[in-house]
């Protein structure tokens, strides 16, 4: 796992994220084409897997393969993925993310990301699940249980 630098971001929202079923904090970051993509643009009426990641990490390819399998199986049932990269190397990230079928955005603040701090992300990868109503219902601690977690809210 990759540690995230601590920040003096909103302590109130951090406490809310620790609770179950809070509304999500919208995120708007640039995608591989430089267009800003909002989390809310993919979340309407969908179950969303939010992933804070670093493509340069050794665990990233295997995790993205797992996400690809889940996306293939459950996208037509309402699953979306919103993946936030904290990679510092823009070109590496663009090359790695350009062929992924889900929303891939990058926070140029890298490990100093205020967005990651607001979601109380202390290390990568960090995975959250939103239900169809936009409630943050799960912080995934075990990737092996990710499919069951997704199925429980689809």
Predicted segments with their positions:
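Loop/turn elements at helix/coil->beta-strand transitions in domains of secreted/extracellular proteins
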Residues: 44-47, 77-79, 100-101
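Thiol/disulfide oxidoreductase modules built on the thioredoxin-like
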Residues: 111-153
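Active-site-proximal beta-strand/loop segments in catalytic clefts of secreted hydrolases
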Residues: 52-53, 84-87, 107
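N-terminal "domain-start" segment that seeds a small globular fold
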Residues: 11-40
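Short acidic-hydrophobic, aromatic-tinged amphipathic segments that line or gate anion-handling sites
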Residues: 103-108, 140
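Short active-site neighborhood of thiol/selenol oxidoreductases, capturing the structured segment around
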Residues: 39-61, 67
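Single conserved hydrophobic/aromatic residue that forms the stacking wall/gate
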Residues: 1-9, 13
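Structural microenvironment flanking redox-active thiols in thiol-disulfide oxidoreductases
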Residues: 61-98, 111-115
């Amino acid at each position: 796992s990759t540690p995230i630098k601590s920040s003096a971001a909103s302590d109130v929202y951090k406490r809310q994220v620790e609770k179950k079923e809070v509304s999500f904090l919208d995120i708007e970051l640039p995608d591989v084409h430089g267009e800003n993509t909002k989390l809310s643009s993919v979340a309407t009426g969908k179950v969303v897997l939010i992933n804070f990641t670093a493509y340069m990490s050794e665990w990233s390819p295997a995790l993205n393969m797992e996400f690809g399998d889940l996306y293939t199986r459950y996208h037509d049932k309402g699953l979306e993925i919103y993946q936030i990269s904290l990679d510092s190397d823009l070109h590496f990230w663009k090359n790695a993310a350009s062929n992924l079928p889900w929303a891939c955005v990058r926070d140029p603040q890298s490990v100093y990301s205020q967005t990651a701090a607001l979601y109380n992300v202390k290390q990568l990868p960090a995975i959250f699940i939103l239900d169809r109503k936009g409630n943050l219902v799960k912080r995934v601690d075990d990737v092996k249980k990710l499919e069951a977690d997704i199925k429980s809210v689809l």
